[in-house]
Amino acid sequence: MSDKTVKSTNLMAFVATKMLERQEDLDTCTEMQVEKMKTSTKARLRTESSFAPRTWEDAIKDGELLFNGTILQTESPTMTPASVEMKGKKFPIDFAPSNIAPIGQNPIYLSPCIPNFDGNVWEATMYHHRGATLTKTMNCNCFQRTIWCHPNPSRMRLSYAFVLYCRNTKKICGYLIAKQVAGIETGIRKCFRCIKSGFVMATDEISLTILQSIKSGAQLDPYWGNEKPDIDKTEAYMLSLREAGP
């Protein structure tokens, strides 16, 4: 087995443990799913003991380190001040540090920047790759990604969102409306794959409409030039975009 298998096991050990720490927020079905994920992860850990011996606690610690660049939240969405409204529902956004570097050789990630006639607004271009529909507004290989994950106890779903920006032009370059995927373990793995593959955006028509509204109103903001995220400024900025509307 590869080192990737070990890392995946460590990640799932960390995620399962963190989710069960907020057991009171999970309904019975969701709790059973997470417990099943924990059991299967422990079984994988025993299988890997012949070539990568480690304790459950060690796996959790390493999984937490591997999780650097993303953030898993099991708090109530109402605790997050910034949100985007879609079909009358508000989807919260949270911000986390992430790496600033191209990822892999994803053809969509490596596609060129596409400015419109006046060079100020970046045209959204639809791509279809491996069954996913993605929207690319621009690409300078300098993306900063952030992800928000929230297990929804009532629907047994995992929602996630990406906010992307370009440090070269100091503009927002992409935005992914929170999307729900079925199954806790499947959803978490899908989030990991999105990050590792460098996919910029997976969207539907509603998401694209909101994206176009946000990018057309993109403006210079001190946050985008910062070396590290300024959480308060960013949340206030995204909140102002939502309140301004299309």
Curated annotation (Swiss-Prot):
Annotated effect of mutating residue 189 to K: In strain: C/Ann Arbor/1/50-pi
Transmembrane as UniProt keyword: no
Residue ranges of coiled coil: none
InterPro entries: Flu_C_NS1, Flu_C_NS2, NS1
Keyword Cytoplasm: no
HAMAP family documented for this protein: INFV_NS1
Family: Belongs to the influenza C viruses NS1 family.
Additional observations: The strain C/Ann Arbor/1/50-pi causes persistent infection.
Protein's job: Prevents the establishment of the cellular antiviral state initiated by host RIGI, which normally triggers the antiviral transduction signal that leads to the activation of type I IFN genes by transcription factors IRF3 and IRF7. Also participates in the up-regulation of the splicing of viral mRNAs.
Record's protein name: Non-structural protein 1
